[in-house]
A protein has these predicted regions:
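Short, charged/polar surface micro-motifs in flexible loops or helix N-caps
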Residues: 26, 49-52, 307-310, 356-359
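Short, hydrophobic beta-strand segments
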Residues: 120-126, 313-316, 363-369
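DNA-contacting surface of Y-family translesion DNA polymerases
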Residues: 11, 20, 203-346, 419
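Short Gly/Ser/Thr- and Asp/Glu-enriched loop/turn motifs at secondary-structure junctions
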Residues: 115-119, 156-159, 295-299, 344-348
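C-terminal hydrophobic structural anchor segments
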Residues: 327, 333-390
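Gly/Gly-Pro- and Ser/Thr-rich, intrinsically disordered tail segments characteristic of DNA damage-repair
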Residues: 1-237, 250, 288, 374-424
Length: 424
């Protein structure tokens, strides 16, 4: 176990003691634990290669030596490492191991907030504030001894810096980020190392001369707002250590904030016609789940990942709340049409809806609304939902999906994949 910066590991009197624990190469580590014969080989866990969902979901330390990247296609990974051993993902198995790890966390606090299957925040302020580093060491050793995998743990006074700490040194390491050392450890790191600064945000920051987390922390807040909107305020606060978000308690009710689906296509999507086929299936799935849970949404988000693994996300807020498949599909396609450049084929796309209201609120109408048409569409959607629930997803489909049965032959509602956080 490697421990980074024990000299500056003391938290201040009024600080919280937050841990972020990350199971190293989780999916791959579990597979190697269950099959010791492959432990010393380059191993990657992947999706279904036959349906071109054969992307790398996780890899072990040996595979990392060949620069294997999460999210790339199996064939690309094997080009770098011909001897790469790929094993299919077994989410039910990983869920059981995740539960075992969380049971150890719960021995120390009831404030355990999962972040995917492989990561979690712990708030140990109440009982172990003055012994945060000691507790981190103990948790790390117990997981290694009792379960057989390793974790990297960040110790800090807020969730953002604790997460940074767990990423700072891997595998099997503990890093303390305190008020005395964060300007050295955090500020000198690339902007993209800050939680929630994705590829698109990083590129926008680079365009205005911001390359490190320290650059974000010391940038004029007005500059960040101009180029990033409210997101600029958020990451400015994160970079300066202002995060005060609480760690949720075990079993604490968490209100649904978004409903979405994404998929890797069986072939590259080269035009809007290709995108439309998959987008409809995704939108239909999202809207069915919204209706099942009694929600209507107002903000539609789309994501696009090209063959170079570059991802962009865009969103649009509607004038009224809706759960109609036609409304969400229309908004999603407008975003795809506006942002797809026809030059870079897409490997995967996603659709999600946020900004919810319960479907029992009065319908908001405007002068352009056709209430009779809306009521008719609501009845149609509900009827189709019942048919699909009883007879399966393929019992009835729009004729437009028949133009390419290969692209549309998936059911995201039933085949939703849980990816490790690193994939996102």
């Amino acid at each position: 176990m490697k421990i980074c910066d024990t000299v500056n590991s003391k938290l201040y009197k009024n600080d919280r003691a937050i841990l972020h624990s990350d199971c190293n190469c989780f999916y791959a580590s579990v597979e190697c634990l269950l099959n010791p014969n492959i432990r010393d080989l380059p191993v990657a866990v992947s999706g279904d290669a036959e349906n071109r969902h054969g992307i790398i979901l996780a890899k072990n330390e040996e595979a990392k030596k060949y620069n294997i990247k999460t999210g790339e296609a199996i064939w690309q990974a094997k080009k770098k490492c011909p001897q790469l051993l790929t094993v299919p993902a077994r989410l039910d198995v990983y869920k059981k191991f995740s539960d075992k790890v969380r049971r150890i966390y719960s021995n120390y606090t009831d404030m355990v907030e999962p972040f995917g299957l492989d990561e979690a925040w712990l708030d140990i302020s109440e009982d172990y504030k003055n012994d945060a580093l000691t507790i981190a060491k103990e948790i790390s050793q117990r997981i290694k001894d009792e379960i057989g995998i390793t974790v990297s743990i960040g110790v800090s006074f807020n969730k953002i810096f604790a997460k940074f700490g767990s990423d700072y040194k891997k595998p099997d390491a503990i890093t303390c980020i305190t008020r005395d050392n964060y300007k050295t450890l955090v500020w000198n790191s690339p902007a993209g190392d800050l939680l929630y600064v994705g590829g698109a945000t990083r590129k926008k920051l680079e365009q205005i001369g911001i390359y490190t987390i320290g650059d974000i922390a010391n940038a004029p807040i007005g500059l960040l707002r101009t180029h990033l909107g409210k997101w600029g305020d958020l990451i400015y606060g994160f970079a300066n250590g202002y995060d005060s978000s609480p760690v949720a308690r075990i079993g604490e009710y968490s209100e649904v904030k978004s409903i979405g689906n994404s998929t890797t296509a069986v072939r590259d999507l080269k035009n809007l016609d290709d995108i439309k086929v998959i987008a409809y299936v995704l939108c239909d799935s999202v809207c069915r789940r919204m209706r099942e849970q009694g929600f209507m949404g107002k903000t539609v988000c789309v994501s696009m990942r090209d063959t170079g693994l570059s991802t962009i996300t865009r969103q649009h807020t509607l004038n009224t709340y809706t759960s109609l498949t036609s409304d969400i599909t229309k908004a999603a396609m407008a975003l795809f049409k506006e942002n797809f450049d026809n030059k870079s084929p897409l490997r995967s796309i996603g659709v999600s809806v946020t900004d919810f209201a319960h479907n029992n609120i009065p319908r908001q109408m405007d002068i352009f609304s056709d209430e009779r048409k809306i009521i008719a569409e609501e009845k149609l959607d509900k009827t189709l939902d019942k048919l699909k629930q009883r007879f399966g997803n393929y019992i009835i489909r729009p004729a437009s999906l028949l133009t390419d049965r290969g692209l549309s032959a998936f059911n995201p509602k039933d085949e939703h994949t849980i990816h490790p956080v690193g994939y996102l």
